[in-house]
Structures are given as structure tokens and as C-alpha cells.
């Protein structure tokens, strides 16, 4: 008689179902904030960052990396995050600061401003990516954190929504580049606007793609988005 196979005692791999609060729980009993930025890649406009402290008992459903969500889903989640979060804040670094510091340090500055603006001080921050920014509290970096941590996912949504609104406003102030549609990223209308109008006050003039577009050396269908990615 064949014996039935024994049940495996090996731990089962985690089944991915989207972001959860496991990373937050692993940080211990203190306040944990998620931190993420938006706008490292575009050729124009500020870089934004958000810091969010979530109540584990009131986590909005549907949180995910902001880039994976529709504009409608992000707008709904932004409202809910702001309603239920223990604390949240969005920080910005200007085009002048980006040009002076470089985009990576400007993103870190925006993160500092977001954390400093929280109504309560976090004990630790979960930061998307692998770069160890100098922030106002201890940090833990999380690669692809906006797909793993609800707090980071919430921060990614707030940062993107805040920056997108700014770029819509910039489109009205600086028409002809299509900022409202592409939010400062590479697009045919953006390249053509640079060729026809020259740079606006919010363009990142030190960036190679902007220089190439202004010199007429970047095709409108080129796949080059930025110098750094992100």
C-alpha cells in the first residue's frame, strides 16, 4: 500500500497580492511612515515627495504603485488616504534646486520637507528604492517598495497627484509644450515645443535630452526619457 506524501514543513513563499503592512509591522511598535517621490525623470517641473503614516486598522483598499493605477483610481485613493492617514505631507524641490543640487539630492530635499511637515514625528521611514537619503529619522530602503508596502504606495500616490496638478497649472502658465498631458516627460509635443519656443522657465536646462531637443538633435519619437531613469 502506497503511503500518502507527507505534508511539507517548509515555509511557504509569500503569495503576492499587492502592497500590505508586513514591512511596517516588522519595524516594531513605533510610528512608520512611507516615503516616495515623483518627478525624477521629467525634463521640466519640480520633484515632489510624500510621507504618509497609515493606521494599520484603516488602510485604504486598492493601494498600489501609482504608476500602475489609472488617473481615476489615484484621485479616489488620494482623497481616502488624506482622510484616514495618521499624518501625511507633500514636499517639493524647485527647478532651481534641481539644477543646483542635482535631481537625486533635490529628491532627498523634497523627502526631508515631507517628513518635517508631518504633524507627528515618525520613528522610522520606509523609503522606496535603494538610495540611502539623509532624512530626519532612521530609514529602511525598500526596492520596489511602492509595490510591497501600503505606506510607500500611499506616498507614491500623493506625490504623483500633487506633482501632476502642478504640471497642469504650468501648462496654463507656459502653453505650447503640452505639460498637462505628459507632465514634463518625453513626448512628441514636448520636443516640438522646445524646438519651436525654446525652453520655459521650468525646464531642466542641464539635462542632456533638453539640450539635444533644443539643438534639434533629438527626434520627437526618440525613446530617451531622461538621463537617470526613475
From Swiss-Prot:
Keywords from the named record: Cytoplasm, Endonuclease, Hydrolase, Manganese, Metal-binding, Nuclease
Catalytic activity: Endonucleolytic cleavage to 5'-phosphomonoester
Gene3D superfamilies attached to this UniProt entry: Ribonuclease H-like superfamily/Ribonuclease H
Residue positions binding a divalent metal cation: 36-37, 128
Pfam family, one: RNase_HII
Family named by the database record: Belongs to the RNase HII family.
Protein's name according to its UniProt entry: Ribonuclease HII
Record lineage: Bacteria, Pseudomonadati, Pseudomonadota, Alphaproteobacteria, Caulobacterales
Amino acid at each position: 500500500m502506497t503511503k500518502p506524501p507527507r505534508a511539507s514543513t517548509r515555509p511557504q513563499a509569500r503569495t503576492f497580492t499587492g502592497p500590505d503592512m508586513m514591512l511596517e509591522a516588522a519595524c516594531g511598535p513605533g510610528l512608520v511612515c512611507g516615503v516616495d517621490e515623483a518627478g525624477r525623470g521629467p525634463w521640466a517641473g519640480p520633484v515632489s515627495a510624500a510621507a504618509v503614516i497609515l493606521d494599520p486598522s484603516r488602510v485604504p483598499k486598492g493601494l498600489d504603485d501609482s504608476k500602475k493605477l489609472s488617473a481615476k483610481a489615484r484621485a479616489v485613493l488620494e482623497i481616502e488616504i488624506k482622510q484616514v492617514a495618521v499624518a501625511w505631507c507633500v514636499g517639493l524641490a524647485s527647478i532651481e534646486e534641481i539644477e543646483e543640487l542635482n535631481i537625486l539630492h533635490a529628491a532627498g530635499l523634497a523627502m526631508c520637507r515631507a517628513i518635517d511637515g508631518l504633524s507627528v514625528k515618525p520613528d522610522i521611514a520606509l523609503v522606496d528604492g535603494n538610495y540611502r537619503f539623509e532624512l530626519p529619522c532612521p530609514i529602511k530602503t525598500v526596492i520596489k517598495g511602492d509595490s510591497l508596502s501600503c505606506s510607500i504606495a500611499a506616498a507614491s500616490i500623493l506625490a504623483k497627484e500633487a506633482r501632476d496638478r502642478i504640471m497642469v497649472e504650468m501648462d496654463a502658465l507656459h502653453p505650447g509644450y503640452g505639460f498637462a498631458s505628459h507632465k514634463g516627460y518625453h513626448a512628441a509635443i514636448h520636443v516640438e515645443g522646445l524646438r519651436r519656443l525654446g525652453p520655459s522657465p521650468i525646464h531642466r536646462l542641464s539635462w542632456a535630452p533638453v539640450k539635444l531637443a533644443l539643438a534639434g538633435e533629438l527626434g520627437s519619437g526618440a525613446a530617451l526619457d531622461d538621463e537617470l531613469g526613475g
